[in-house]
């Protein structure tokens, strides 16, 4: 067997590219594979939010659910610090701007939720303060007069999802990693020194070549394909795939410096460096499924007109001047969450040398996920308690 590596990273999104880059910097022999192209799927389709406050999906189910979701806050804080220096370390622009993020409220119930959320986040070390209407007049005059308060985190912001992962992939190659696109991992067998993995590569002419690669370790950084890849290694990695709606407007003079989210609605919006406004926040799209109801991730998922309209209404309600800005395009992005909304990060039970990271905010938390995984690959003890994110926590007999 001619090909051998210290680690094979599966998934060419931001997380996979970061892991390949960091591991290669550590001196590991790294192969990064993606069944399609680098940045083709979730990392390149998302809206590029860097949201370190708890999102609406994490608090809409109530205070207890929010407390559980807040257990990921050490990863949020770590990622916020890493994003602040990532462009300098990579040596390229990733479109990062951490100019602050607002979660806005329109009524007393939502303000009460903001106060609870801010207290919870501060207990974990995230600096969040609540702004009243008069303060918002100065900080965010573009907001609707219906907005009566907001939580502000100075760490939040945005990155450019179109360029971030490709830039990191180039840095990984410069550090010595090999990158193979159009290459699907289809099988694995355990060996005394790690794994022999079967790779199926399709070249640009459609010709298929299958080869086996020996590796000491495998990292699953494959988003919605996590559960499928776990099965290749005989492991149960339960995830819930989601198809979500995004919309981009035409260019408009810069007027929104913040990431904006809502305490009572599915909304995130921010103005990109090219002056378009990106609108998202969790409005569903139609995830394509087969006749048995199983998701088919290789098919093109479908937009739902009422989601596009609902998302646009939420955006205009928060920022009224957007009503005069034409929408240019809407598209579907995918993500995956765990049943308890916390990420899966760490070693895969029953599959020695296999590691995984995934869960809801993998773009935002990608730098932290990758740093943790790279440390585990190198045998370093993690400086973040990974117990709440244990991939085995849903396995029968495991203690959450």
Segments and roles (model prediction):
Residues 39-40, 209-211, 215-257:
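Central helical "cap/lid" subdomain
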Residues 25-46:
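Glycine-rich FAD pyrophosphate-binding loop
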Residues 151-216:
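Helical element adjacent to the flavin cofactor pocket in flavoenzyme catalytic cores
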Residues 7-32:
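N-terminal Rossmann-like FAD-binding beta1-loop-alpha1 element of flavoenzymes
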Residues 92-103, 117, 124, 128-175, ...:
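Helix-loop-beta segment of a Rossmann-like dinucleotide-binding subdomain
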Residues 313-400:
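C-terminal catalytic lobe of FAD-dependent flavoproteins
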Residues 49-135, 266, 306:
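Dinucleotide-binding Rossmann-like beta1-alpha1 core, especially the glycine-rich loop
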Residues 253-351:
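Active-site lid/adjacent beta-loop-alpha segment flanking the redox-cofactor pocket in flavoenzymes
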């Amino acid at each position: 067997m001619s090909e051998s590596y210290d680690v094979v990273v599966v998934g060419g999104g931001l997380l996979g590219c970061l892991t390949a880059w960091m591991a290669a910097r550590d001196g590991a022999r790294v192969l990064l594979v993606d069944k399609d192209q680098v940045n083709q799927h979730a990392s390149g389709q998302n809206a590029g939010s860097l949201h370190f406050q708890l999102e609406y999906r994490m608090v809409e189910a109530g205070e207890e659910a929010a407390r559980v979701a807040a257990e990921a806050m050490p990863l949020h804080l770590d990622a916020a610090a890493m994003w602040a220096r990532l462009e300098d370390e990579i040596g390229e622009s990733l479109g990062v701007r951490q100019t602050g993020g607002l979660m806005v409220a329109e009524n007393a119930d939502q303000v009460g939720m903001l106060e609870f959320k801010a207290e919870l986040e501060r207990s974990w070390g995230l600096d969040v303060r609540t702004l009243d209407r008069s303060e918002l007049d100065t900080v965010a005059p573009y907001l609707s007069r219906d907005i009566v308060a907001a939580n502000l985190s100075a760490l939040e912001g945005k990155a450019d999802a179109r360029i971030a992962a490709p830039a990191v992939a180039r840095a990984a190659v410069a550090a010595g990693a090999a990158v193979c696109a159009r290459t699907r991992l289809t099988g694995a067998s355990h060996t005394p020194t790690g794994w022999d993995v079967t790779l199926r590569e399709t070249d640009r002419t459609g010709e298929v070549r299958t080869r086996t690669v020996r590796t000491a370790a495998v990292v699953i950084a494959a988003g919605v394909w996590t559960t499928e890849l776990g099965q290749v290694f005989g492991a149960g990695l339960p995830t819930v795939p989601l198809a979500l709606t995004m919309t981009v407007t035409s260019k408009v003079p810069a007027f929104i410096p913040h990431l904006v989210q809502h305490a009572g609605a599915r909304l995130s919006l921010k103005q990109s460096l090219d002056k378009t406004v990106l609108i998202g926040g969790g409005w569903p799209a139609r995830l394509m499924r087969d006749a048995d109801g199983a998701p088919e991730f290789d098919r093109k998922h479908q937009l739902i007109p009422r989601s596009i309209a609902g998302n646009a209404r939420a955006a205009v309600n928060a920022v009224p001047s957007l009503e005069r800005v034409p929408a240019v395009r809407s598209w579907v992005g995918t993500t995956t969450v765990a049943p308890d909304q916390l990420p899966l990060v760490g070693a895969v039970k029953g599959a020695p040398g296999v590691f995984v990271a995934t869960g809801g905010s993998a773009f935002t938390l990608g730098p932290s996920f990758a740093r943790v995984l790279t440390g585990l690959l190198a045998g370093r003890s993690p400086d973040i308690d990974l117990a709440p994110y244990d991939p085995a926590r849903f396995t029968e007999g495991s203690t959450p």
